[in-house]
């Protein structure tokens, strides 16, 4: 069998030079250089080749009360990624090579969704003004929901931002969190999905489920059953959505994260539900590097690949379907 090609649909990138834009101060395990240099070094395998990545914004520091003036950090973050693509990296930002310049296939910057459609449009125009030559790789936007208070996503301004993205052909990377947030996030999200059903939502990390639930008794767990009902409704409501098979290492206990077999066992019940919904055409692989490398350690992409292979083996998935999930489905999801 030939090696699999991978389009890693969820990685974060930053250097020590621009880490002040982010929340990861010294002492945070994510502090440091997390550039394409480090990603490539930690994504080697005899079983696959990473042929592309989708860059996802890092939740930069912002001040929405200042309008566009309070959004300089995510704009600078976008410009850093543009320098990775055009080969004009600053000395402390890494070493540019032809391979690295073509590795980023799509960009998903931050968008100020609570500011409404007018605020998002003004911000997107600012991105284009600051760098237009690489803007064609901006395929959508993200604004993390997982750590926000109730009623954030259901606010009329937020809904109008979704409508603007839909009208302009962008995707939205959706980050909600069952384990640390709660099922109320799913209920609010579902209500918004009903208002803007046709936007292409890319749902992150299997919805960050409670992977500490006992897999042996999970089928009778009321929270698992409620989650299953809600994600089923979410799937039915959004005909253009995709699900990322990613993020598992961050949701299990540390001792589990260090063992591929144990991680696979805890992920399986949740994977089975979402795969029966989104299926072989709308499921996409992602490593969530470097976030998931904190619990899993070095060679994250290889380890998560092994988890996925175990999951795929458990349902008898054929090789052609695996190739879709690892590679070609992400091209469709992100309009690449």
From Swiss-Prot:
The keyword Metal-binding applies. Keywords: Hydrolase, Metal-binding, Rhamnose metabolism. Its EC number is 3.1.1.65. Pfam families: Amidohydro_2. GO terms for molecular function: hydrolase activity; L-rhamnono-1,4-lactonase activity; metal ion binding. Coiled coil: none annotated. GO terms for biological process: rhamnose catabolic process. It is an enzyme of class 3 (hydrolase). Signal peptide: none annotated. Its cofactor is a divalent metal cation. It catalyses: L-rhamnono-1,4-lactone + H2O = L-rhamnonate + H(+). Divalent metal cation. Inhibited by Zn(2+), Fe(2+) and Cu(2+), but not by EDTA. Belongs to the metallo-dependent hydrolases superfamily. Hydrolase with high substrate specificity for L-rhamnono-1,4-lactone. Catalyzes the second step in an alternative pathway for rhamnose utilization that does not involve phosphorylated intermediates. PANTHER family: AMIDOHYDROLASE, AMIDOHYDROLASE-RELATED DOMAIN-CONTAINING PROTEIN. Part of gene cluster that contains the genes for this rhamnose catabolic pathway. This is L-rhamnono-gamma-lactonase. It comes from Scheffersomyces stipitis (strain ATCC 58785 / CBS 6054 / NBRC 10063 / NRRL Y-11545). The gene is LRA2.
């Amino acid at each position: 069998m030939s090696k699999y090609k991978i389009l890693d649909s969820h990685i974060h990138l930053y250097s020590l030079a621009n880490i002040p834009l982010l929340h990861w101060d010294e002492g945070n395990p994510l502090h440091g250089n997390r550039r394409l240099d480090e990603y490539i070094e930690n994504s080697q395998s005899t079983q696959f080749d990473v042929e592309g990545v989708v860059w996802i914004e890092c939740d930069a520091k912002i001040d929405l009360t200042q309008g566009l003036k309070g959004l300089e950090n995510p704009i600078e973050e976008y410009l850093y990624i543009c320098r990775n693509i055009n080969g004009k990296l600053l000395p402390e930002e890494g070493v540019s090579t032809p391979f690295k310049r073509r590795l980023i296939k799509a960009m998903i910057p931050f968008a100020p969704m609570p500011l409404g459609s007018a605020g998002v449009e003004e911000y997107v125009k600012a991105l284009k003004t600051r760098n237009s030559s690489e803007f064609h790789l901006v395929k959508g936007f993200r604004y993390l929901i997982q750590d926000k208070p109730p009623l954030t996503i259901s606010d009329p301004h937020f809904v109008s931002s979704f409508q603007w993205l839909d009208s302009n052909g962008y995707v939205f990377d959706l980050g909600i969190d069952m384990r640390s947030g709660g099922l109320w996030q799913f209920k609010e999200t579902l209500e918004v999905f009903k208002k803007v059903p046709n936007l292409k939502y890319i749902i992150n990390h299997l919805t960050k489920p409670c992977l500490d639930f006992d897999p042996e008794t999970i089928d009778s767990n009321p929270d698992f059953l409620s989650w299953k009902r809600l994600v089923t409704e979410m799937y039915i409501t959004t005909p253009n959505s995709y699900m990322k098979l990613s993020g598992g290492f961050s949701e299990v206990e540390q001792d589990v994260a260090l063992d591929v077999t144990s991680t696979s066992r805890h992920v399986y019940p949740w994977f089975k539900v979402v795969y029966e919904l989104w299926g072989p055409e709308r499921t996409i692989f992602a490593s969530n590097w470097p976030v998931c490398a904190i619990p899993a350690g070095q060679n994250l992409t290889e380890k998560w690949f092994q988890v996925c292979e175990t999951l795929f083996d458990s349902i008898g998935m054929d090789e052609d379907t695996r190739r879709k999930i690892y590679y070609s489905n992400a091209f469709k999801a992100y309009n690449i």
